[in-house]
Amino acid sequence: NAIYDKGHLLSSISNARLFDEFCKIFLGGLGEKNFNKLCSFNLNKHLVISDPDESDFSHNIMIQALRNTDDRIKNNQSVTPGFLLAALLWPKLISRCIKNNEINIRKFFRSMDGVLREQQKLTAVPRKFNSYIKDIWVLQLKLHSRIKSQPYKIIRHPRFRAAYDFLLVREKASFDKNGLGKWWTDFQKNDDSLRGSLIARINEKSDTDSSKKFGFYNELR
């Protein structure tokens, strides 16, 4: 089969050209189908450094992110390669900072640039998307913690909506039922008394170990 025999030639194509191909393949409304086809020929490694076969979660979040992107396109909603890359690279990022089924926050921050540099070798991601991707990643920490009045600041962040959408993708890919996504869905409602009660409940639990842990259970296995 020519695809199997010649697939290695993709590594000789410029990373700028491959970024263009990344956008055409994954941002045209058939991203999930195209990704599955690439995986069947073992060609996905030429476009994304994350390996969908590394874990069930890796596979789930990559598929869920692509499905989410396809759905947005069908609904005439905006899409950006920055959001998709934030999701596709997430398994690679967290795999570098997990210890004893917990994410080491210091390693989390130290690993971000390294992951992006590795992806850059495959696809020349425009610099403007690097800060976008890192904002989405860092906001995941804050979306989990919800310390005191922090949620009020988070919803004013220019990347909040993208970070919230990514949280829902992670939650779905993890099959998590603890309601973090719903908490943020409810918090966005313009109701001060509801927001106050939501925060009060979190602050009551702030001294428990579970409230200080970051990440969904299946994400950390």
Residue map of PLM features:
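Glycine- and charge-enriched loop/helix tracts that form the active or gating conduit
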Residues: N1-K99
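Short, mixed-charge aromatic SLiMs
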Residues: D5-F19, K107-V125, D186-S197
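Phenylalanine-focused residue identity feature
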Residues: F19-F22, F26, F35, F41, ...
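Charged substrate- and nucleic-acid-binding regions of tRNA-handling and nucleotidyl-transfer enzymes
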Residues: H46, K121-R221
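Composition- and surface-driven signal marking solvent-exposed, interaction-prone regions
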Residues: S50-D53, N100-E102, K177-W184
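Extended, charged alpha-helical interaction scaffolds
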Residues: E54-H59, Q77-I154
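Detector for methionine-enriched segments
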Residues: I61-M62, M112, K212-K213
